[in-house]
Structures are given as structure tokens and as C-alpha cells.
Curated annotation (Swiss-Prot):
Residues 548-560 have a biased composition (Basic and acidic residues). This is Vacuolar protein sorting-associated protein 64. Pfam families: FHA (PF00498). Its main location: endoplasmic reticulum. The chain crosses the membrane at residues 579-598. It comes from the Eukaryota. PROSITE patterns: FHA_DOMAIN. Residues 185-257 form the FHA domain.
Length: 604
């Protein structure tokens, strides 16, 4: 059994794995012949490897650790050189330089040449891992095998969140986590793989299920499935948008963009597509960049409970004495003396569910206090040349640095820097409060003086304004009064002139009336004389006519039988003319009387 275990070689180093330390290429270690362990040169040399989580190619969460490893007892005796080598291979340490299979083979030969079995200790029986298994280990084990961590990618201790608010009520407010380049967040219409194509209601339900406030899907027919893409520059922290050859185009502040990156800032408007008609399903997506937040990623140290992946390939064989970790079989009975595990970690890790709420509260507090701090600028200042310190901790005994210690020191340095900044803020607040309380009387007096000066300025300005307004009103009223007086004088002069004209006209009318009265009196006298004369003449004429009539009657009686002579006819005609003349004179007298009565009735 011992000879069989001697012939078995240790597990090969995994490519792109943080669980491997390159002993052959690392600075500070020299490769010796196969019959002797590696020798360390005199003096301290600086290690080129970086701590995990900073420059690693693959995250720790990509590997599956069996939960039974926490229950293994610690080693009772110090490990040998070969055991330290295997412990370095199984311990999670970052290696920037990946060895080729030929180097792995030479290293395996060197390890086989060393006596691996001191008293009471044996090696770990491990099966070789094929190259396809190495590729599988380099991928995510959380259900998606599309995203890979790229070599040399910077630490991502913060994330950018962009808040898009709708301008035309086409979607709910979105809170999008923008990934770093070369990754991107797709914006577009969700893809539905509905079996029943005629059922439009089910398709609409699928659309509504896929459109959420935390993804880039929008429910609009004018959008393409791959319409636009959001990405963040890891060096500058700027957020960019680019069009993905959409049919209806992408517009930033009303300007159509192409396939190149365009920076987004707070206050910009983003239009996806164009309006086809007034219906809701054919409207464009008009969004407003309300805010861009920088949130630090809390709890970057992965708990062992998080190291166990969803797709864990763990089986127990040989009556519970062997463990299979993704194709690597480890003898559980012989592993207990090679990987020392602290017994107190189990108690802390079992309380992960209890401390999750505290972690969430702390994350919210840190995001509120330090959300405006760009962690990429603090990496070198906070952590510094961390591997120079951390790699030299176990360099004297040819042991690697534990990933837990590295993460613990990183977490402590980060927390110390944040606490220092918080303390500086508190100190500044304390200084402000002290200065405020000390200078409170002076500040109050100064404020009172300033208020009095301000009040005086306001009062003088108000008085000046009121006086100017009063003067303007007085001047305006005086002008109006003068104008009214002038108009009154004009009216008085016009009235006096009119009265004078009326008086003169009245005098003229009175004089004319006097003259008419005199003329009427004269006419009355004349009429009276004429009437008397006419009356006397009429009586005489009547008497003469009667006498003549009597005479004529007598003559007629005498000469009834005789012929009337021409002389008698002439006499008769003369009588007729006399009668007509008397009648004419009477008519004239009557007319004069009527005129006199009419003149008397006229107003004086």
C-alpha cells in the first residue's frame, strides 16, 4: 500500500486557478535537482504574485468545496517539505504565471523523487484531471457558462447603477446595473418563444413577465431585440451607450448615434426607436437619465457557504473514505494531516444566515456614506503592494499564503480606510459643532447686525420707493387739476360769450317787438278810424238805398207797363257798382280787425 501511494503523483496544477502556486517560475525560489527539495536563496525576495480577488483570472466562487472538509481534524505534527508542496497546491493562492504541461510534468517528477512518507504520514491519492475538466473549472458554476473572467481584469469593488425615468409613460422606472467593458447590458425588446403563435394574449403575458425594472427589456414594437447596449469603462467609471444596428435607431439628446460609444450623463434623454402611430404598442421608448450611482460592493470576502456551487459534483466512495471534487478524487482518510483547518470557522460559517441581515444593513450604510467614493482610485492607496507583505509571511518555511488570511487582511485594510474616512468626517463635524457653539454669541450678534443693516437698507429703499411714487402721484394729480381748471375756464368763457350773444339777440327781439307794437297801435288807430268812417258811410248808403228803392218802386209801379229806357238801365247799373264798393270796404275793415287781435295775442 505504501509503495502504491509512493508511485502516485500529486494532483496537477490547474490552469487559470487561484489554488496553484508556481514554485518553478516564482521569484525568490530556485529549482534544484530532483533529489533535493527547492532551496530558498539568502535574503528576502519580492513575490510577483498578487492576492486573490485583485488580479486573479478566476474567482474563488467558481470552485466547489465539499462541506465535509470543515469537519476534518487539524494536523498534529509539522508537515514535511512534500506535504508543504501539496498544501500549496491545494491552498487557494493566486498565481499570475501559468505553467505549461511540460513544466507540470517536470515538477511532478521532482515531487515523485522526494520521499513523501515520513513517519506516520502518507500522501493524498488523487486522480489526474483531464484538460476538458480544466476548461470546465474556468467557467461559472451558477447555471451560466457564457461569462468568463478575463486575464488581467481590474478589481471590481464597486458597481455603477443608472436610473432611467420614462418621459412618455411607456415603462416603469428602471434601475440598471451597468457591467464593465467588454461586457454590456442589452436594451431591446424581449424574445418570446411561444409555442402557440396565434395566442397573442399568452405572448403579451410573456412580454410582461420578461419586462422588469431591473433589466433592459422594454415592451414596445418599434424596438429591435438587440437595440442598444450599455457599458461602463472600468478605468474612468463613465457609462457609454452604443447602437446595435437597430432598425429604428437610437437617439441621445435628439441626435442619432451609430455603432460607436456615446457617453451618458445625468440629465441626458435617450430615445429608443421612433413613433410609428399614436397607439401605445407602437410608441418609442423615451427615457431620462435621472441619476448615476456608484455603489461599493460589500462582503467581497467569499464565505465558505458561498463557495459551494449550485451544480456541485460531490460523491462519497470507498465507504466514506474518498471524496470527489469535480473529477479530483481525494482520499479522505489521508487528507486529515495535510490541510490544517481552523475549528472556529465552522461556528462562524454556520451563522451565515443570522448575519445576512446585518450585512445588508451594513451594505446600505456603506452605500449611503461612501457611495460617492471611486474604489478604483483607492486600490493602490488602500491595499498597496499587498503581495510584498503577504507573500513573505510564510516564505521562510516555503509555505504559501492562505486565501483566508489574504482576504481577511484585505477586508481589514478596506474597513480601516473606510473607518478612517468616517472618522475624518466625524472629526470635521465635531470641529464644526465646537466652533459653532464657541462662536454662537458672535454669530448671533453678527447675524443681528447683518439683519439690522439689511432691515435699514430695506427701509431706506422702501421709503425712497414710496417717496418717488408719492411725488409721481402728486405731480400727476397737479397736472390733472391744471388741465381741469383750463377746461373749466374755457367752458366759462364759452358760456359767458353765449350768454352775451343771447342777451344781444334778446334785446334785438325786444326792440323789434316794440316797433311791431307801435306799428300795431298805429294800425289799430287807423283801423278804428276806418271802421267808424265805414260804419257812418254804410248807414248813409243804406238810407239812400232805401230811398232810392222806394222811389224806384214807385217809378216801377208807374211805369210797369212802359218800356224801360236805357237811362233807367244805366241808373240800375250805377246802383249795383255802389253796393259792390261798400261791401269791399267792409271786408277790408274786418281783415284789419283780425290782424289787430292777432298782434295782441303775440307774447310780449
Amino acid at each position: 500500500m505504501v509503495e502504491l501511494e509512493k508511485r502516485r503523483r500529486p494532483p496537477p496544477q490547474l490552469q487559470h486557478s487561484p489554488y496553484v502556486r508556481d514554485q518553478s517560475n516564482s521569484q525568490g525560489m530556485t529549482k534544484t535537482p530532483e533529489t533535493s527539495p527547492p532551496k530558498r536563496p539568502m535574503g528576502r525576495a519580492r513575490s510577483n504574485s498578487r492576492s486573490s480577488g485583485s488580479r486573479s483570472n478566476v474567482d474563488i466562487d467558481q470552485y466547489t468545496i465539499p462541506p465535509g472538509l470543515d469537519l476534518l481534524p487539524t494536523a498534529s505534527s509539522p508537515p514535511s517539505v512534500h506535504q508543504v508542496s501539496q498544501q500549496q497546491q491545494l491552498s487557494p493562492i493566486l498565481a499570475n504565471k501559468i505553467r505549461s504541461p511540460f513544466e507540470n510534468q517536470s515538477q511532478d517528477q521532482n515531487d515523485n523523487s522526494i520521499d513523501p512518507t515520513p513517519a506516520g504520514q502518507v500522501t493524498i491519492p488523487v486522480e489526474a484531471v483531464s484538460p476538458p475538466a480544466l476548461d470546465e473549472l474556468s467557467k461559472f458554476q451558477n447555471g451560466s457558462t457564457e461569462t468568463l473572467f478575463r486575464t488581467g481584469s481590474p478589481r471590481k469593488k464597486h458597481t455603477h447603477i443608472i436610473i432611467l425615468k420614462s418621459l412618455n409613460a411607456t415603462f416603469e422606472t428602471k434601475f440598471l446595473v451597468v457591467p464593465f467593458k467588454p461586457d454590456g447590458l442589452k436594451l431591446g425588446r424581449p424574445v418570446t418563444n411561444s409555442v402557440n403563435k396565434n395566442n397573442s394574449g399568452s405572448k403579451r403575458d410573456l412580454f410582461s413577465q420578461q419586462v422588469r425594472p431591473d433589466n433592459g427589456n422594454f415592451d414596445s414594437r418599434v424596438l429591435s431585440r438587440n437595440h442598444a447596449c450599455l457599458s461602463c469603462d472600468p478605468t474612468s467609471g463613465k457609462i457609454y451607450i452604443r447602437d446595435l444596428k437597430s432598425s429604428n435607431g437610437t437617439f441621445v439628446n435628439g441626435v442619432k448615434i451609430r455603432q460607436n460609444d456615446v457617453e451618458l450623463k445625468v440629465g441626458d434623454t435617450v430615445d429608443l426607436g421612433t413613433d410609428i402611430d399614436s397607439k401605445f404598442e407602437h410608441r418609442k421608448i423615451s427615457a431620462y437619465v435621472e441619476e448615476i450611482s456608484v455603489i461599493p460592493l460589500m462582503n467581497t470576502v467569499s464565505d465558505p457557504t458561498n463557495l459551494v456551487m449550485k451544480k456541485q459534483d460531490h460523491t462519497n466512495k470507498n465507504n466514506g473514505n474518498s471524496t470527489n471534487i469535480n473529477g479530483i478524487k481525494i482520499d479522505r482518510g489521508h487528507h486529515n494531516q495535510h490541510i490544517p483547518i481552523r475549528s472556529h470557522l465552522k461556528e462562524n460559517y454556520t451563522e451565515a444566515g443570522v448575519t445576512s441581515a446585518t450585512t445588508a444593513q451594513r451594505a446600505a450604510f456603506e452605500a449611503a456614506m461612501f457611495g460617492d467614493i471611486n474604489n478604483s482610485e483607492l486600490d493602490d492607496d488602500i491595499l498597496g503592494p499587498e503581495t510584498e507583505v503577504l507573500s513573505g509571511i510564510f516564505i521562510n518555511n516555503s509555505a504559501g499564503t492562505s486565501i483566508n488570511l489574504i482576504n481577511m487582511i484585505k477586508t481589514l485594510t478596506t474597513e480601516l480606510s473606510l473607518e478612517k474616512q468616517e472618522l475624518e468626517k466625524l472629526h470635521s463635524m465635531q470641529n464644526f459643532m465646537q466652533n459653532y457653539t464657541i462662536n454662537l454669541d458672535f454669530i448671533n450678534k453678527h447675524m443681528i447686525d447683518m439683519n439690522e443693516k439689511h432691515l435699514l437698507k430695506l427701509s431706506t429703499a422702501l421709503q425712497k420707493t414710496l417717496s418717488e411714487n408719492n411725488d409721481a402721484l402728486l405731480k400727476e394729480s397737479e397736472d390733472q387739476l391744471k388741465e381741469i381748471k383750463q377746461q373749466n375756464n374755457k367752458v366759462k368763457s364759452a358760456c359767458s360769450l353765449k350768454e352775451k350773444q343771447n342777451h344781444e339777440k334778446l334785446q334785438e327781439l325786444e326792440s323789434e317787438l316794440r316797433e311791431l307794437n307801435l306799428q300795431i297801435e298805429e294800425e289799430r288807430g287807423k283801423n278804428l278810424v276806418l271802421t267808424q268812417s265805414n260804419f257812418n258811410g254804410g248807414i248813409n248808403n243804406d238810407n239812400n238805398a232805401k230811398v232810392k228803392q222806394n222811389d224806384s218802386r214807385e217809378e216801377k209801379k208807374d211805369t210797369e207797363d212802359t218800356l224801360i229806357s236805357t237811362e233807367e238801365l244805366g241808373v240800375v247799373e250805377g246802383k249795383r257798382t255802389r253796393v259792390s264798393k261798400g261791401m269791399l270796404f267792409g271786408v277790408v275793415a274786418i281783415s284789419f280787425g283780425l290782424v289787430a287781435t292777432a298782434v295782441k295775442q303775440l307774447p310780449q
